[in-house]
Amino acid sequence: GVHSGDATLVFPAQKIYFETARRIKKVSKMIAKELNISGPFNIQFLAKNNDVKVIECNLLASRSFPFVSKVLKRNFIETATRIMLDAPYTKPDKSAFDIDWIGVKASQFSFARLHKADPVLGVDMSSTGEVGCIGDDFNEALLSAMIAVGNRIPQKNVLVSSGAAKSKAELLEPCHMLAAKGYNIYGTAGTAKFLNENGISATAVCWPDEQGDLNIMDMFSKHVFELVVNIPKDHSKRELTNGYKIRRAAIDHNIPLITNARLASAFISAFCNMDEKDIQIKSWQEYK
């Protein structure tokens, strides 16, 4: 999995089952009551098919605390402090999450300064900063956040190395969107074969350790690609070596790199459905 500090956060949640959300609220109340918690606390949940499990509970305010405060326009630090001091406070309304805007928190990475480091995310936190952006809808908020941390919307050429079967299937619809928008899609052998078999024109490129006219490392040197989606597949020596070389080349040539299929899918869907020029410039106070 990916460390929660590196994950892209969407608030309020857009794709959680109603029953899952209900159970999360119920479990949170039970834990707070049983442990007699009066201040901020952080719970990490694992949810699948409405089955909710608690991974960990920490009696502290996470970095998402100020982000949530900004999105909901309520200073939860002040509220928590008042509760801990037994001072008067106003309870948040039950409809506090019913807002007409969405917040997205994206992580900032410094792999360009960490020479030879593998820019892939894992259980250890790698991000060195983050940004929070608000938009009228998910696409606007996500694009704003992704651009704010240094990503650029591609104009013509996208490289996709989609990894295992699950991530290939997850990236199929986004690749349909890219093709419909006129993008040139390049893929490693397995990905290109999968896309072509599913009606998407994709050009196969050679792995770094292969010889050919379309060697991927030569194409990086020529700055052919404007976005690289590289989903790690397995831990075989060849996959690890070639995958690392692709990811590192993207960073070294200052090309936006995404290594998570869900984030890649969301980002592609966002810029295919919304032009960068349509992103509104609004102050925080205008969201009301």
What are these language model-derived features?
Residues 1-154:
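ATP-dependent carboxylate activation and anion-phosphoryl transfer catalytic cores
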Residues 138-143, 162-166, 185-187, 206-217:
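A general structural motif
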Residues 147-158, 177-180, 219-225:
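Glycine-rich phosphate/diphosphate-binding loops that line cofactor/substrate pockets in enzymes
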Residues 156, 192-220:
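Active-site rim loops that border cofactor/substrate pockets in soluble metabolic enzymes
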Residues 159, 182-194:
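Short internal beta-strands
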Residues 166-177, 191-192:
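N-terminal active-site wall of soluble small-molecule enzyme domains
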Residues 206-208, 215-288:
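Peripheral docking tails and interdomain loops at the edges
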